[in-house]
Structures are given as structure tokens and as C-alpha cells.
């Protein structure tokens, strides 16, 4: 259970970081 929760948290963090990068790139344009 803990491993699954940790994996989900890491996946969500990576997704948020990717979305932030994309938004930043769009802002530059």
C-alpha cells in the first residue's frame, strides 16, 4: 500500500513539473 501511494505521489509530482514547464514555455511565446 505504501509503495503504491509513494509511486502515485512521484507520478503526480512529475506530471505537475511537466505541466509547469509547458505552461512556462507557452508564456515565453
Swiss-Prot record:
Coiled-coil positions: none
One Gene Ontology cellular component annotation held by this UniProt entry: chloroplast thylakoid membrane
Places the protein is found: Plastid, Chloroplast thylakoid membrane
Role played: Component of the cytochrome b6-f complex, which mediates electron transfer between photosystem II (PSII) and photosystem I (PSI), cyclic electron flow around PSI, and state transitions. PetL is important for photoautotrophic growth as well as for electron transfer efficiency and stability of the cytochrome b6-f complex.
Alphabetized UniProt keyword annotations: Chloroplast, Electron transport, Membrane, Photosynthesis, Plastid, Thylakoid, Transmembrane, Transmembrane helix, Transport
Gene: petL
Annotated transmembrane regions: 3-23
Family recorded in the similarity comment: Belongs to the PetL family.
Principal location: plastid
Protein name (record): Cytochrome b6-f complex subunit 6
A GO biological-process term: photosynthesis
Subunit structure: The 4 large subunits of the cytochrome b6-f complex are cytochrome b6, subunit IV (17 kDa polypeptide, PetD), cytochrome f and the Rieske protein, while the 4 small subunits are PetG, PetL, PetM and PetN. The complex functions as a dimer.
Topological relation to the membrane, as annotated: Single-pass membrane protein
